């Protein structure tokens, strides 16, 4: 797995080596946590504490997830400085996606109902996308939205590298 500039993403390899998480209180004890065993998408940027992945959803180009590396369920499970650090990454991703994709609106969501592993969805929205004004998990409103800007994973990766602080790890 390559994160950026041809470097092996050691963070993903560490995450990939985990196989099971006991997710107490979520009805998933002993089941596999998808975000502990997979990257959750194409890795665009990674640090020791979190990673940014591109979600493969042709209806929502630019849809990214910011995934906390350690298996925790809620924002309140983090220390205040960790929360701030995670949100700084979420806001950086939002800034880059807005700049590159020029959506009508951005949605930020942290649900975790199906995957109780702390992660944020950063979703560009257009007035004519499949679900607008519903959330992307809601009822489909239309079948054929107009084409939206095509931006490569490499372009997103480079823009994220510039947006996030140079002292942050990139792979």
Which residue ranges define each predicted feature?
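Short intrinsically disordered, low-complexity coil segments enriched in acidic
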Residues: 1-4, 158
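Residue-level signal for mature regions of secreted extracellular proteins and peptides
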Residues: 2, 14, 26-29
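Short linear/disordered segments characteristic of secreted peptide precursors
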Residues: 8-9, 14
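Low-complexity, intrinsically disordered or signal/transmembrane-proximal segments
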Residues: 14-20
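HIT superfamily nucleotide-processing domains
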Residues: 20-171
């Amino acid at each position: 797995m390559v994160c950026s500039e041809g470097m092996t993403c050691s963070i993903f390899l560490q995450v990939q080596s985990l196989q099971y998480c006991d997710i107490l209180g979520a009805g998933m004890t002993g089941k596999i946590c998808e975000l502990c065993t997979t990257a959750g998408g194409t890795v665009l940027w990674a640090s020791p504490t979190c990673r940014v992945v591109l979600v493969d959803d042709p209806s929502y180009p630019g849809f990214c997830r910011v995934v906390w590396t350690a298996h925790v369920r809620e924002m309140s499970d983090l220390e205040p400085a960790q929360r701030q650090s995670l949100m700084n990454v979420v806001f950086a991703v939002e800034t880059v996606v807005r700049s590159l994709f020029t959506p009508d609106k951005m949605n930020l969501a942290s649900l975790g109902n199906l995957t109780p592993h702390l992660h944020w969805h950063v979703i560009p929205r257009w007035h004519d996308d499949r679900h607008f004004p519903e959330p992307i998990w809601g009822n489909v409103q239309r079948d054929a939205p107009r084409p939206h800007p095509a931006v490569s994973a490499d372009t997103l990766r480079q823009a994220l590298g510039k947006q996030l602080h140079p002292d942050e790890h990139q792979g």
